[in-house]
């Protein structure tokens, strides 16, 4: 299960379609995805709720628990107002830059503003897959929130890739 509709915003068919979309995208991008709807908890921001939910449910793929969670955080039962948050973890932080998350948010709000909650989730999921296909934005930096340290993200250089291919070829020829 990757759709957690605690606020009851989705119809059964919408949940089914979102689960199917998430399953396909998880297979395509190799990272976890989840959609959560919930009512605002006293003393818990949307970010805190989303991050705690992701960790608490053991979501994530690979050694870095990579993935993203889209939270629709309603003010309360029967309310039409609320907040949203897009959390990213592990390798997903490389794909979902602050700018990409801002763009996702603008698109999500366009659907949330007309109470199209499933449409908002679908749009966010499809855009995340599109960003995954586009790849990591060049010139990124790593920021460690605990230490405040910033370091450049280093990708594989052409000569490193060539050396890896050479080593793999030599190993295959020797086998």
Q: Where are these predicted regions, by residue range?
A:
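Selective detector of the "anchor" transmembrane alpha-helix that sits immediately C-terminal
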Residues: 158-175
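Folded, non-transmembrane soluble domains that reside on the lumenal/extracytoplasmic side of membranes
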Residues: 1-162
